[in-house]
Amino acid sequence: MSHGDTIRVDASVRAKCGTGSARALRAAGLIPAVVYGKNRDAVNISLSHADFLKKCRTLPIFSQLIKLCIDGKEEFALTKEIQKHPVSGAVSHVDFQFVDRGAEIKVEVPLVFLNEQKCAGVKLGGALNILHRSLLIRCAPDAIPQSLEVDLLDLAIGHSIHVSDLALPETMQVAMKEENPVIASVSATAAVEEAKEDGAPEESAQGQGAAEAQETNK
């Protein structure tokens, strides 16, 4: 999928609400759901459990625009929350939010990390720390990216990658509260520190020997 793509979800308005009605829907292979939005009445809907679960497993359901076809009428929305049964993992309820395609929205976009095993700092024994696996951005609904890439190849021990280091399109703005947060870093491990300490006396001895040789030659 690319910018501007949508995920189609077919749904029907449900007249009845409540625990009993929701239980009956689930028994029939349906998911009770709701769509809400600013200055709009909430709409209670139901959708196919099998179809939606498949989309959850194969598509970026939280970071892509949803085309809700409610009894044949198209509405655009974002998936805001998915509730699942703690044991079976079955989807028990979904919250959608109406989207105005003419206005910018905030959305969480997953980060894809490249070259984790080839990372310069990791190859030298450092520990890779991933601090954020998604990024809250503001953009037009039709410009939501499926994901954002973070290349770790040249990340050295003691260094980090900040949000400002990411190459974001001009049509996209970071909407996180924290100013320029760290996305990933590589820290020195105990083994790396020990290696440094083990090498220090040898370097010191070499330096001392060189100094003594200079004194002798004077």
Curated annotation (Swiss-Prot):
The keyword Ribosomal protein applies. GO terms for cellular component: cytosolic large ribosomal subunit. Residues 202-218 have a biased composition (Low complexity). InterPro entries: Rbsml_bL25/Gln-tRNA_synth_N, Ribosomal_bL25/Gln-tRNA_synth, Ribosomal_bL25_b-dom, Ribosomal_bL25_C, Ribosomal_bL25_long, Ribosomal_L25_dom, Ribosomal_uL5_bac-type. GO terms for biological process: translation. GO terms for molecular function: 5S rRNA binding; structural constituent of ribosome. Pfam families: Ribosomal_L25p, Ribosomal_TL5_C. Keywords: Ribonucleoprotein, Ribosomal protein, RNA-binding, rRNA-binding. The keyword Plastid does not apply. Residues 187-218 are annotated as: Disordered. This is one of the proteins that binds to the 5S RNA in the ribosome where it forms part of the central protuberance. Belongs to the bacterial ribosomal protein bL25 family. CTC subfamily. Part of the 50S ribosomal subunit; part of the 5S rRNA/L5/L18/L25 subcomplex. Contacts the 5S rRNA. Binds to the 5S rRNA independently of L5 and L18. This is Large ribosomal subunit protein bL25. The gene is rplY.
